[in-house]
Amino acid sequence: MKKILLFIAVLIQLSAVQAADRFVTFKPVADALPLATATVSFSDQDYEAVKIAVANLQADFQRVGLSLTAGTSAEGTSILVGTLGKNPAIDRLKLKDLKGKREKFIITNVGNQIVIAGSDRRGTVYGIYELSSQLGVSPWYWWADAPVTKRENAWFMKGTYTDGEPAVDFRGLFLNDEAPCLTSWVKNTFGTGYGDHRFYEKVFELILRLKGNMLWPAMWSWAFYADDPENGKTADRMGVIMGTSHHEPMARNHQEYARRRKEWGAWNYRANKENLDRFFREGIERMKDTEDMVTIGMRGDGDEAMSDKTDVDLMRSIVDNQRRIIKEVTGRPANKTTQVWALYKEVQDYYDAGFRVPDDVIMLVCDDNWGNIRRVPVTPQEKKHPGGWGIYYHVDYVGAPRNTKWINVTQTQQMFEQLSLAYDHGIQRMWILNVGDLKPMEYPIQLFMDMAWNPKTFTMQDVTRHTTLFFRRTLGCKQAKEVADIYNRNCQYMGRVTPEMLDASTYNVETGEWRQVADDYARLERRALRLYDSIPAEGRDFYRQLVLFPVQAMANLYDMYYAQAMNQYLAKAGSPDANEWAAEVSRCFKRDSLLCLHYNKVMSGGKWDGFMTQKHIGYRSWNDNFRHDMLPRTTTVADDAPAGYTFAASAGYVSIEAEHYYSAQASAGTQWSVYPYYGRTRSAVALTPYTQPVGDAALTYRFTMPAGVKKATVHVVTKSTLDFLNVGGHEYTVSLDGSEPQTVNMNKTLVDRQPYMYSDFYPAVARRVIEKTVDVSVDKDGDHELTIRPRHPGIVFEKIVVDFGGYKPSYLWMDESPYKR
């Protein structure tokens, strides 16, 4: 038996180790091992983290419709799970590729037995969850309701598989800015005013399934250790390294100080050293027997600077005393306890002023809270820092110039580019991501963790392929590429401006820019809705959370602020049409609340009640210190003005829809009729019926131009009517301010014969319009009246443009100019 095991071990060592791509198939393959009914065995000596992961693996088998029972059996495929040094059966295999490795797993087969082996407890756990993932259980099965497809069978394809070692040693999340969303959801879900071990157990499982290993717990109003003593124990059992945030030194949560401020005294090390050292010592006493990481240094009380000055000597004294406490409490040299110093905001000034921490301490640099790396190690001395470098990165932020808390606004490309920049400059020891409430930051979390494990899997040119693969693995649908495109397009649009910074003044309403960006979102929402109908029912909640809701919410927000911009624009011109836009603002504001209500109360059966309670409409400064979302201000215009339209020139032109005349005169037995939806823009106008003489019929358009204009060009756009009367062409006249009328023959050359067929006829009928121009002299300032008189029946007018230097030829003749009535 020993010889057989030795032979197998040699085979394993010599076999080519593949990346853990696909070793599970759902179609029969020759010599593959069936998984419909399997057994799993592990050693009682193994880590508790491994046993918990095995229990989750059994549950995952059930989720996909398969069976995995503990123990061994002659029937079905057996799975052996174990960690080097903790499972004799694993040790006997002599898996050389695992020895001395960090968090590495190997999945292989020994004959007809599947083996999942890890170099340490997390390596084994990652191997277990890799099998779960390949069976179709996404890391997001619970946190985002990723669908799980039922299977009648699955097969393990024989071979040896691994993902190697992680590129970054410490890979974690920071729950932050947790009120009101996460706190509300926890209260609704777990019935507590804080995160207890039941909540954190779900967070830890997600981190491990994503091949992460670290957490900074929420700290605004919660105290991880004090709220529930089981929290820290649960982290240790499951194999998650705990840390505390950049301003919470010595394994103490800020709330542990804030709740007992009178007892501990001032957060001032120079004046209150004795009490603060005692506070620090208690934190190290609590964590000394764990893998937990210790934040060193000190900031001011409540995530603020200690003072206006950069007191290097004081910081040196603080760190020296903290290191002394670590050594005294643990009974080990200080460098045997992992420590980090965060160069966050003003703390970087200490570094720039020459302060240096001991060689073993991780140097944690930060982004600017908006996803841009502030600095990287540059000098040879910095690059060789033995403790290594880390990055603290944000996809959630509270602070100036404006909060970003509601939904994800981080572009995939920016995150990839900046994290690649960090990694390529040697920031490879620790990556920590500020994820706010965790939801709705699901995809940035996935991308961050995948990059922390192996940042070289993708390039900047094909990073969107990561998004496609993510949705393919989680949704399991053929539309994954389209889903990914919608997701990335939405990120691109949100990258233009965050929802908290968006308002009516963001885009230019006069140039049509506002309408363009609102239309961009409207088209994206239509795409997302069409795709929703094709998503399998079991995947729709996941699709709603990650794709449809963010698109709909932002599209609606754009509609609302566009409507506010139009209301302001038209109200200035005194136009009662401003009132319609004011009503649209109210409608969109109400829809926003309904979308959030649906997310909280209806989606996934109300499972995520509370996550969409973040205020996002009504910011006046960086923070959200207002009671609730506020309806944007609008202006109502009294609708008692004359019926006619008066236009205001803008940017060197006046653009007028033909139906918006100041006055109209019809001949006996006729009337001016508006044809809705006729033409390229809004409508068209014609004197009807065509069988009656036109007489003295006329349309008059009124507008204002700036002083000093001496000449202009009038563009008259009509339907491409042919000379059906055979009178040598339909004619109309154009006159400005009572000047001598100029006659325009609009269709004399519109005949399908040479020499006009290709030059005049085909272009006009293909474009469906005839555009003629008339040059006019401008003899006065102020208000002007342009009169157009048809000389033949059957002329259909669509648009009038008066150009005095600013009109740019466009297919739709520019957006209509502002007007009043």
Predicted regions, residues:
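Bacterial Sec-dependent N-terminal signal peptides
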Residues: 1-24
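Contiguous, structured surface segment used for ligand recognition
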Residues: 20-165
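Intrinsic-disorder/low-complexity accessory segments
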Residues: 78-136, 198-202, 210, 249, ...
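Feature activates predominantly on carbohydrate-active enzymes
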Residues: 98-270, 288, 340-344, 354-372, ...
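C-terminal non-catalytic alpha-helical accessory regions
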Residues: 146, 150-151, 464-614, 697-699
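Gly/Pro-rich turn-and-neighbor structural signature
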Residues: 154, 219-220, 226-237, 264-386, ...
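Structured mid-domain segments that build the active-site/substrate or prosthetic-cofactor binding neighborhood
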Residues: 208, 213-216, 222, 365-371, ...
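Extracytoplasmic
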Residues: 616-821
